[in-house]
From Swiss-Prot:
Subcellular locations according to the entry: Cytoplasm
Transmembrane feature ranges: none
Protein name: Citrate lyase acyl carrier protein
Role noted for this protein: Covalent carrier of the coenzyme of citrate lyase.
Taxonomic lineage from the root: Bacteria, Bacillati, Bacillota, Bacilli, Lactobacillales
Gene that produces this protein: citD
């Protein structure tokens, strides 16, 4: 699926993550900012990548600013940003 517009989901509050998706042309590229990047950076990137792959999004630039979000929050924010970027109103139930 192709990203139609830049989209954002999430906040910069504690225990949340802000995900911004932009059109890309070279696979899934993730720019992650996090205070816990050394401990959890690989896991955060894995959750984002897996969620985008489940949504059949192959080419996207991701800007993620993590403030200690749990995996379920990261997945929810990624799904929301993707639906906004794809300009779809129908939830992807199979990913949930």
């Amino acid at each position: 699926m192709e990203i139609k517009t830049t989209a954002v989901a999430g906040t910069l509050e504690s225990s949340d993550i802000q995900i911004m998706l932009m059109a890309g042309d070279n696979g899934i590229q993730i720019d992650l900012e996090s205070d816990v990047i050394k401990q959890f950076g690989a896991q955060i990137k894995h959750v984002i990548t897996t969620t985008l792959q489940q949504l059949n999004i192959d080419n996207v630039k991701v800007r993620a600013v993590d403030k200690g979000a749990l995996d379920c929050v990261i997945k929810a924010r990624t799904i929301t940003a993707a639906q906004r970027a794809l300009e779809t109103t129908t939830p992807a139930w199979e990913v949930l």
